[in-house]
Amino acid sequence: LIFGRAETEEGPKSVFGIIHRSDEGYAIKDDWDTLGMRATQSMTTFLRGVTVPEERILTVTDPGPSADPVIFGIFSHFEILLAATYQGVGERAVEVAAEHVATRRSVKNQTTYSNDPDIRWRIAEAALIMNAVGPQIRELARDIDAGVDRGRSWMPQLSAAKNAAAEATLRTVEQAMRACGGSAYYNTHELSRLYRDALAGLFQPSDQESLHAAWANLILGPIEKAQ
């Protein structure tokens, strides 16, 4: 699935269509060398004169946010599934931390860290952060399946769910690493990988800037231009 900009008599339009990997002009650069999310292999895609046949055009719409079924379908499923992915990362971080402190012993207290009140508080805090993520994702997913009309608030609320999940996961993994101590800093520790993966949530759509701009437009309307 690709999209491009077309200049038409009615003004600029966004065109969404399907191409095949075998199509002439399509190429992928093997450049996915990132801090985290390495398994996704999200390489740079090059489109050099690629032609999309008319039968593979999904929709043509005005640029920007749109209620077009194709645009909404792509965006809604992407944001919900991305939010659920980060929820899974955060919940796994809590599990790993709980397993770790159950075997890590405290020299000071002569027992495992799972009996240390401060460590117990930290892991409980991580779990509480993640506990608030799931309901928002599930409600949005149910409303998508049921065809609920949320009007103009749909796009901002979908972005908010992804953002909430990503930010919560980052805070959760940090708490888990603090609870586990320096060993979690090693690349061989699962929490190290989870932390690197959680950082990707800062950059994936919708980021903080576009999220806040969308909510400001929803609540306050567009910015008024000075006369």
Language-model segments: what does each one mean?
Residues L1-A27:
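A short core secondary-structure module
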Residues T34-M130:
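Glycine-rich beta->alpha junctions and the first turn(s) of the following alpha-helix
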Residues S106-Q110, R150-G151, T188:
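Flexible, glycine/charged-enriched surface loops at secondary-structure junctions
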Residues G182-Q227:
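Glycine-rich phosphate/cofactor-binding loops in nucleotide/flavin-utilizing enzymes
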Residues E95, E99-A102, N131, P135-R138, ...:
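Charged/polar positions within long, soluble alpha-helices
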Residues N131-A164, E174-Y185:
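C-terminal helix-coil-helix/basic helical segment that borders enzyme active sites and/or dimer interfaces
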Residues G88, A124-N131, S159, N163-L170, ...:
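Generic structural signal for well-ordered, non-transmembrane alpha-helical segments
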Residues G4-T8, W32-M37:
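A generic local secondary-structure boundary/capping motif
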